[in-house]
């Protein structure tokens, strides 16, 4: 069986394979591998959708919990403005996009990478409680302008000049992620 998770679809193909030795009739080492397709199906759930789910369910949820723990009673309005679908000035829209590319997507991909090695029988989870910064160690550090875009409004709302999104822990529950699939 082959599973191909692409950007737009996930495709499943199940083949049987046989060897064709041609005129040699089984002697020698030259043979053709002949596939016979038994099943093929495609699904509209793809890699981009899975990454989006990880960003929503893990990264943004951890950000929301982190803001509540930092003292922000209702993080929804500020998050809606910073990372929601509200219309922004062109410069802020670009920074929102860069926040996703430099912070949210790499963390989502890191969670998916950890999930690839997840064994439901072992229940190992080496990511839970690591900070945004720790999960971004293997990629280029986010730019100051991107960090300022998210940190400054939150600092003002919290009255805490030292707030930094990179210090927040990420709550990763691989068992829960496993149950979603």
Residue map of PLM features:
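Nucleotide/phosphate-binding catalytic cleft detector across ATP-hydrolyzing
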Residues: 1
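Short acidic, Gly/Ser-rich segments with clustered Asp/Glu that frequently serve as metal-coordination loops
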Residues: 6-11
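Phosphate-binding glycine-rich/basic clefts of nucleotide- and phosphate-handling proteins
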Residues: 14-174
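C-terminal or late-domain output modules
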Residues: 173-181
